[in-house]
A protein has these predicted regions:
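A conserved amphipathic terminal alpha-helix motif
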Residues: 103-135
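A short small-residue
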Residues: 2-4, 98-103
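Short, intrinsically disordered, mixed-charge
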Residues: 20-33, 63, 118-129
Length: 135
């Protein structure tokens, strides 16, 4: 069974600018509707995406290249443990970002989460462009 979403993007900003967008509360708020994050392994994460909130705990943190956290919806839990990971790979003035969301319970949830992450990654790319222009 395919229980995962995996998406990749390449952005025109240095990794030093990109990693904080996935690993700090201020960075997440640049492309999500809201976020709180305790940036340490075991720290709590809470994000708002439109009218939904997701919660989790930081599972791994290896700046400036990797963060992963558990993920579940506050109002409508998935009923399984799922994990979101971002890998941020330096490529000179550009950065490759891979998002993986694994442990989704069924094909319908995979499809819903893929659509959701595509939307939010578009906003992530916009935030990267804005930061690159300021740098």
């Amino acid at each position: 069974m395919n229980d995962r979403v995996e998406l990749q993007t390449e952005v025109g900003a240095a990794r030093a600018l990109v990693f904080p967008l996935v690993a700090t509360a201020d960075g997440l708020r640049r492309w999500l509707d809201g976020a709180t994050l305790d940036p340490r392994v075991g720290g709590e994460l809470r994000v708002t995406m439109r009218d939904a909130q997701a919660v989790g705990r930081i599972l791994a943190l290896d700046p400036p290249q990797h963060i992963s956290f558990s993920w579940d919806w506050l109002e409508r839990p998935l009923g399984v443990a799922s994990v979101v990971a971002f890998d941020v790979i330096d490529h000179g003035a550009r950065t490759w970002v891979t998002l993986r969301h694994v442990g989704l319970p069924n094909a319908a949830q995979v499809a819903l989460h893929e659509e959701m992450w595509r939307h939010w990654l578009d906003r992530f790319e916009e935030a990267c462009r804005a930061l690159a222009q300021l740098a």
